[in-house]
From Swiss-Prot:
Predominant location category: membrane
Marked site: Cleavage: G116, E117
UniProt PTM: The C-terminal 3 residues are removed by ATG4 to expose Gly-116 at the C-terminus. The c-terminal Gly is then amidated with phosphatidylethanolamine by an activating system similar to that for ubiquitin.
Gene Ontology annotations of biological process type: autophagosome assembly; autophagosome maturation; cellular response to nitrogen starvation; mitophagy; protein transport
A GO term, aspect molecular function: phosphatidylethanolamine binding
Lipidation (Phosphatidylethanolamine amidated glycine): G116
Job of this protein: Ubiquitin-like modifier involved in autophagosome formation. With ATG4, mediates the delivery of the autophagosomes to the vacuole via the microtubule cytoskeleton. Required for selective autophagic degradation of the nucleus (nucleophagy) as well as for mitophagy which contributes to regulate mitochondrial quantity and quality by eliminating the mitochondria to a basal level to fulfill cellular energy requirements and preventing excess ROS production. Participates also in membrane fusion events that take place in the early secretory pathway.
Membrane topology reported for the UniProt record: Lipid-anchor
Propeptide residue intervals: 117-119
A GO term from the CC aspect: autophagosome membrane
Tagged with keyword ATP-binding: no
This protein's name: Autophagy-related protein 8
Lineage, uppermost ranks: Eukaryota, Fungi, Dikarya, Ascomycota, Pezizomycotina
InterPro entries in alphabetical order: Atg8-like (IPR004241), Ubiquitin-like_domsf (IPR029071)
């Protein structure tokens, strides 16, 4: 899936920003979170997040749910490289395994399990 953030910002600028963030906040993970294009779920108000390294994927999902004001009965799925990461996994381990060459971790979310595969 194409990232709008990548389309809007040149690689060198993204890489420099991620490096600056990691140097200044070495206990944080730079994350870009975008909605899957064809999903009917609400669009998030901001794409860039600075996530504590010890946050779990489940806790990050909770943050996203709050930001898009998703009611408890509605489902949300997040994807890293088009697969569902384990809920108990630490964001730091997901970052180490899946960070982009620009230094950001790209996460997409959807109201439906669009890709259907777990890591």
């Amino acid at each position: 899936m194409r990232s709008k953030f990548k389309d809007e910002h040149p690689f060198e600028k993204r890489k420099a920003e991620a490096e600056r963030i990691r140097q200044k906040y070495n206990d944080r993970i730079p994350v870009i979170c975008e909605k899957v294009e064809k999903s009917d779920i609400a669009t998030i108000d901001k794409k860039k997040y600075l996530v504590p390294a010890d946050l779990t994927v489940g806790q990050f999902v909770y943050v996203i749910r709050k930001r898009i004001k998703l009611s408890p009965e509605k489902a949300i799925f997040i994807f890293v490289d088009e697969v569902l990461p384990p809920t108990a996994a630490l964001m730091s381990s997901i970052y180490e395994e899946h960070k982009d060459e620009d230094g950001f971790l790209y996460i997409t979310y959807s109201g439906e399990n669009t890709f259907g595969e777990a890591i």
